[in-house]
């Protein structure tokens, strides 16, 4: 009998079962299949040919053997192995189909992406470089990364070790796994009870038969009864061991699920504020504790800037003097003098702006002349203000 096909199928179950399930599979292959294929056939190959009865009545010996063994021991154990392994094989087919479907869906999602790149944020330049260049660079900038490189990095990371129970739960196979485990347990109990009613716990050396067409009670003799009794007890022990492993696996799944739920609740109590807000894609920002300061652009010291400052100061002083003059009723002549001086200062300021806009000779004679004129105008205006109303004002 060739067991290679069933053995290959059961090896695939090893990849989708728990730690206890792997032990059960080892017992099934090493004891049941190996013992039945090697020891059972060699022990029971002559059970009917060596079954001898002390009668010459035709057909009596066959009828007595049928009464002694309604079903051959080897055929009974082969049928038991097939039925017990059937739920596991069905679970294997369902698991392979579902996992392949999940992998195909993930592959379609990856292929549907428009760009095979992954984006992550990286610091652009150091603070010292930005200060030297007097430029404000972005603190974080996106760096493109190939998906293949990202997958290689994920594959190189060590995966958490587990006994298969978490993998079954993550793949959504827990319900079907429990169902096949229950079916396997029911078959074990059924065959254990059937084996007891068919064969008992001992193979007797002789069997008394009184069936027709036997004329009277006759004695039939069995070959190697002690060896067959030992082998029968071994098969009882293997069946009981497999049944205990099934019960152990059910307890393992139940207590493991309870322990995982308690651990998850404990982690939620320890971290109450974790992940209480929805994830939003925010704009790039600096990491915590990262501060950057950019030096402001320094205003160049030029004569044009001095002229602008002088114009603003003179305008403020004139407004202040007009306010005081309105209350004290200053002479109209003083106002006319001030207006003429303001006009002269404004003309000189326009000349300075024109000279600066050309930028051919920023320190040329025109700027110097404008500078001297602005100083003379400011001195005259200050003198006139002193003679006008006696109020002190600062002129630039």
Swiss-Prot record:
Compositionally biased spans, kind Low complexity: 373-396
Subcellular location, record wording: Cell membrane; Cell junction, Gap junction
Membrane topology: Multi-pass membrane protein
Region (Disordered): 145-165, 355-396
Segments on the Extracellular side according to the record's topology features: 46-75, 199-228
Pfam families: Connexin
Residues on Cytoplasmic side: 1-22, 96-175, 249-396
GO MF entry, a single one: gap junction channel activity
Keyword Secreted attributed: no
GO biological process: cell-cell signaling
Keyword field: Cell junction, Cell membrane, Gap junction, Membrane, Transmembrane, Transmembrane helix
GO cellular component, one term: connexin complex
InterPro entries linked to this entry: Connexin, Connexin45, Connexin_CCC, Connexin_CS, Connexin_N, Connexin_N_sf
Membrane-spanning intervals of the chain: 23-45, 76-95, 176-198, 229-248
Ranges of biased composition (kind: Basic and acidic residues): 147-156
Domain of life from the UniProt record: Eukaryota
Subunit architecture: A connexon is composed of a hexamer of connexins. Interacts with CNST.
Entry function: One gap junction consists of a cluster of closely packed pairs of transmembrane channels, the connexons, through which materials of low MW diffuse from one cell to a neighboring cell.
Protein family according to the UniProt entry: Belongs to the connexin family. Gamma-type subfamily.
Name the UniProt record assigns to this protein: Gap junction gamma-1 protein
Organism: Canis lupus familiaris (Dog)
Lineage: Eukaryota, Metazoa, Chordata, Craniata, Vertebrata
Name of the gene encoding the protein in the UniProt record: GJC1
